[in-house]
Amino acid sequence: MKFATVLAFATAAGAAFASPLASSETTEAGQLSKRQSINYVQNYNGNAANFKYDQHAGTYSTRWTNPPDFVVGLGWSPGNSYRTIKFSGSYSSSSSSYSAVYGWLNNPLTEYYVVENYSYDPCSNSGAQVVGSVTSDGSNYKICKHTQYDQPSIQGTKTFGQYFSVRANKRNSGSVTLSKHFNAWKQHGFANGAANPDFNYQVFATEAFGGTGSASMSVSG
């Protein structure tokens, strides 16, 4: 994201709840989890990015030219620590954008990203602290963190932490094993090391704050 600017708000996104699907899967950590239907639409400034979606099908598309900050996508509310998010599609951007898993914790208030493709690396920002790396889903990810002071958030104007994993081998399809990232981040203070973090929403999203680009994605988990 663009540092010192929060690009998504819980109140700005529509949410419609649906029943979990019947199928189950075993996560990389070995925990059996039930796949759940998309029940949350992330739509912050989507009108500036031609955001279109089919919640039932789990698909969305967006196209932008020099937009204001926007974050759009599909996912779940609340999130959890063991979900494996699957995504596939296309993403192209000239600058200032990510394709990523995105979410928030309620307490401690925290914003997080697992960046799968990008035209701007948030860990390259001078305000970010690179603290380590994690290997997951066929690639190394750089880990960085940052503190936002007195900035808008899902709880109003607050000071809160941000955590990022940025994938070395960019991709437009695959699976994101969230537990691997959360466990790695906990070594650097994420969720104060809590075994069961207090999750707010959790989505696969496209974000941009400049440039031109487009994305079309299918999301499941």
Swiss-Prot record:
Induction: Induced in presence of Zea mays leaves and by xylan, and repressed by glucose. SNF1 acts as a positive regulator through the release of glucose repression.
Pfam family, one: Glyco_hydro_11
Active-site residues annotated for this sequence: E111 (nucleophile), E207 (proton donor)
Enzyme class: hydrolase
EC number of the protein: 3.2.1.8
Coiled coil: none
UniProt domain GH11: residue ranges: 23-220
GO biological processes: xylan catabolic process
Catalytic activity entry: Endohydrolysis of (1->4)-beta-D-xylosidic linkages in xylans
Domain of life: Eukaryota
Main location: secreted
GO MF term set: endo-1,4-beta-xylanase activity
Signal peptide: 1-18
UniProt keyword annotation of Cytoplasm present: no
Record's function text: Endo-1,4-beta-xylanase involved in the hydrolysis of xylan, a major structural heterogeneous polysaccharide found in plant biomass representing the second most abundant polysaccharide in the biosphere, after cellulose.
Name this polypeptide is given: Endo-1,4-beta-xylanase 11A
